[in-house]
Amino acid sequence: MKYKNGLKVFAMAALTASLCMPIHATDKEAEFDLYASVYDYGARVNKVVCELPEEVLMDSIQKDTFRVVSDNKSTINLEVDNGERTIEDIYVSDSKDGERQNFGNYIIIELETNLNTQYSDVLQWDDPSFSNAPLQVEYKVEQVKPMRTTEEKETLYTWKQDEFKQELVDDFTEGESHGIHYRDYKPEEDGNKHPLIIWLHGAGEGGLNNVTHINGNKGAVAFVSEEAKEVFDAPYVLAPQSSDYWMPELELGDLVLKGTDVTKDLVACIRDYMDQNQGIDPTRVYIGGCSMGGYQTWEALFEAPDLFAAAFPICAAYEVPADKMEALKDIPLWIIHSENDSTIPVQYSRDAYENFKKAGGQATYIEYPNVQVEGQDYESHAVWVYPLNNETKDEEGTTFFQWLASQKKEEQTTNWMPLIVVTLVVAGAIFFMKRKK
């Protein structure tokens, strides 16, 4: 009997304790931001940052406290493959980009992101049109376990997405000139002249959205990394987008891509951009691109050889005419291709290099046997990952960034001597005529 009474007392005490435990209601709302970065294989969502109105303890949070699920929407009326993301790490901080702390009002959720990670894309591939389109990036975050605050209260929230932010990409502004849409990065004005780097995207990143070409690979953002800013002395970066394809036509097996020749408009766009940004050093204008962007690099050089200090066509989709090389012989080139490229024959770049040398040009040619990053095989055409990560070096050990940053045209100065001679001759003739009278 005493035993039963003891159980009753214990049960009542436990019930009273549980009722007194301060548990916050689940209808409390808080917001999270999504973050994405551009990798060798394109832009991927890699982080969630949750902001709380109260501080929570780090030791009350584990990976299984949250579920993160992509809920992206197509902008081209295609079905989207969504699903749960793998949480790689989770920690508490005192700011959105802060370090791990014992307590704070920000929860940083780092998501697994690699070449084969599912549901992480910010672009959607459309095979029939051979092009990417931007996704409407949306995620759902669910808190499945309560957390403890610094006041030792358990708290549970309903989470709502706020902003979608992209590292480096958000540092670019957008514009349009001569019918060419572009993204661009401008360094802070400091009264000095800075180089201009022009990046031309490949097939599949064209359109009128002004976003896929900057998210498809590191093409533009590579040149605004901290390393690039230091090597290039804070460059301007211009990333134009073709409305469809740079090339009028390209055959890829049974697939025929038909585009529009906008070379004259592109060059006009570049000149206009330089006129609008007086901080650009006209003796340090560099142009390059990959695949179809490599083709457009060559065409821009032929259209305006006086404009560029150096160029870097990468795995260019172009059998470059040998008889046109003479006009480019004074422009240093860095040409890159992979030997096993199954999209564009490596012979295109080999021939371009040899013909350029025969015309008297100076070029660095780098050929990789394949494309492999950290032991993982990439698509054989994607040789641009090496120069964009500044991992390409010439025989002397000079990196691609170092080589490009060292190129400079001779400043164009006006030769006044012929005018002075003519002026003196005319003045002398007038003086002689007056004396004769």
Say what each PLM segment does.
Residues 26-51, 62, 70-194, 410-411, ...:
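A domain-start/cap signature at the N-terminus of enzymes
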Residues 200-202, 337-338:
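The conserved beta1-alpha1 loop
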Residues 274-327:
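Primarily recognizes the serine-hydrolase "nucleophile elbow" in alpha/beta-hydrolase
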